[in-house]
Regions:
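Alpha-helical transmembrane segments in multi-pass membrane proteins
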Residues: 3-61
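Juxtamembrane helix-loop-helix connectors linking adjacent transmembrane helices
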Residues: 25-39, 62-132, 217-235
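Alpha-helical transmembrane segments of multipass membrane proteins
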Residues: 14-19, 46-50, 85-93, 204, ...
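Membrane-interface helix/loop boundary segments of multi-pass membrane proteins
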Residues: 75, 135-159, 186-193
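Membrane-interface starts of transmembrane alpha-helices
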Residues: 30-45, 119-124, 152-160, 193-196
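Hydrophobic core segments of transmembrane alpha-helices in multi-pass, intramembrane catalytic enzymes
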Residues: 45-50, 124-128, 176-184
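Hydrophobic alpha-helical transmembrane segments
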Residues: 5, 9, 40, 76-83, ...
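Functionally important transmembrane alpha-helices
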Residues: 18-20, 157-167, 171-232
Length: 235
């Protein structure tokens, strides 16, 4: 029987390789990417496959323990850490945002609101703000952290952050994604659960999607998301 750590590492590296290959060969997705029903269908299939792989690897051990599917040890600790993640992302945005353009590089969010395609945009938004955070938190902060913590808490946090960033296949956004991923891993390590991270992650994506079509510059999306976390998150 293969080690769950070997299988997880192999999957993350393969996914990262695929993400960067697609990015460098095909470039950015079209601006109407989130207004398409085909995007909704494709993303659902993708996350279903990832979830099945996570479920399968987790089944090689104590699945609920590996995925950290349990009640957080402390809600108040989650509040403080959530605020800390917000402050950290604000600082990172101010220091690196002028040089790096993470939102522009990813190119997923549209520049304008198209009411004729509102239903498709909302459907894609549900996938990005609900399905994606659940699956990604289970993959990285659940399974990944549980398998890597044997090497130490901080190495696990850093490795989870880096692997999370690599999986997105971006260059300029890499520092932001790695910091966000590591912050969520730290949150998971402190509250011993993936549930608070799912909420923070979901809020981040939801606010980004909302800000993208509100007329505000995309360069400020990360700033807006980070500033809103403490007020909106129940954790």
């Amino acid at each position: 029987m293969r080690s769950p750590l070997v299988l997880w590492t192999g999957f993350v590296l393969a996914f990262a390789t695929l993400s960067y290959s697609v990015r460098f060969t095909e470039g950015k997705p079209p601006k109407n990417f989130l207004y398409r029903w085909s995007t909704f269908e494709g993303n659902l299939i993708q996350f279903a496959i990832i979830a099945a792989i996570v479920y399968g690897i987790g089944g090689l051990g104590d699945r609920r323990r590996l995925l950290a599917l349990r009640r957080p040890t402390s809600w108040s600790t989650g509040v403080r850490i959530g605020a800390g993640i917000a402050v950290g992302m604000i600082v990172l945005t101010y220091t690196l945002g002028l040089v790096l353009k993470p939102g522009r590089e990813q190119g997923v969010t549209p520049d304008t609101w198209q009411p004729d395609h509102a239903v498709a945009y909302v459907a894609n938004g549900i996938v990005i703000a609900v399905v994606a955070p659940i699956v990604e938190e289970l993959l990285f902060r659940g399974l990944g952290y549980s398998l890597l913590v044997r090497f130490g808490r901080w190495p696990a946090i850093l490795l989870v952050g880096v692997s999370f960033a690599l999986a997105h296949g971006l260059v300029q956004a890499f520092p932001f994604l790695a910091a966000f991923g590591a912050g969520l891993a730290y949150l998971r390590s402190r509250v011993d659960s993936v549930y608070p991270g799912m909420v923070v992650h979901g809020l981040f994506n939801a606010i980004a999607l909302t800000v993208a079509v509100s007329g505000k510059p995309q360069a400020g999306i990360l700033h807006a998301c980070a500033a809103a976390w403490p007020a909106l998150s129940p954790f």
